[in-house]
């Protein structure tokens, strides 16, 4: 099993090592939580949940992680370019997180839209992270 914090740390390390994504984000655009004055574009981590769909109880071996992409000036094209870069880096990736085993990422959902209330383009990427323990 992989703790949600360990998983997020591994995801962010993998994304931060991607030079093309860093260029799209202007360097410091990967944020755990965005401050009100955060520069655009940026990516934040949204809800993370660990759940066993068969038994209905919490289970760190099967987690959902949501990443949010935020863009203002360059809009939808920028949002989609950042989303594509993240998908290329994470979809079907296998992460080794500590001694517990391998965590495989599968893209479950992606959406880009304009948020009229916030006046920003907003992209959502939801990944399922499935950990298989080493024996």
Model-derived regions, located:
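Small/polar-rich, solvent-exposed N-terminal microdomains that initiate assembly or binding
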Residues: 1-55, 93, 97-100
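Residues at secondary-structure transition points
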Residues: 2, 6, 54-58, 73, ...
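Acidic-leaning, charged glycine-interspersed low-complexity segments
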Residues: 17, 88-135
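Short beta-turn/strand-loop junction motif enriched in small, turn-promoting residues
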Residues: 50-53, 72, 112-114
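Oligomerization/assembly interface segments of phage tail-like spikes and tubes
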Residues: 59-73, 121-132
């Amino acid at each position: 099993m992989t703790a949600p914090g360990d998983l997020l740390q591994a995801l962010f390390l993998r994304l931060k090592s991607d030079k093309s994504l860093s260029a799209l984000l202007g360097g410091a655009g990967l944020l755990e939580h965005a401050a009100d004055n955060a520069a655009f574009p940026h990516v934040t981590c949204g809800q993370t949940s660990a759940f066993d769909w068969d038994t209905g109880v919490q289970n760190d071996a099967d987690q959902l992680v949501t990443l949010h992409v935020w863009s203002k000036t360059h809009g939808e094209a920028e949002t989609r370019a950042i989303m594509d870069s993240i998908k290329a880096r994470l979809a079907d990736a296998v992460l080794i997180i500590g001694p517990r085993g391998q965590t495989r990422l599968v893209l479950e959902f992606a959406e880009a839209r304009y948020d009229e209330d916030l006046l920003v383009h907003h992209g959502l990427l939801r990944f399922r992270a499935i950990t298989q323990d080493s024996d």
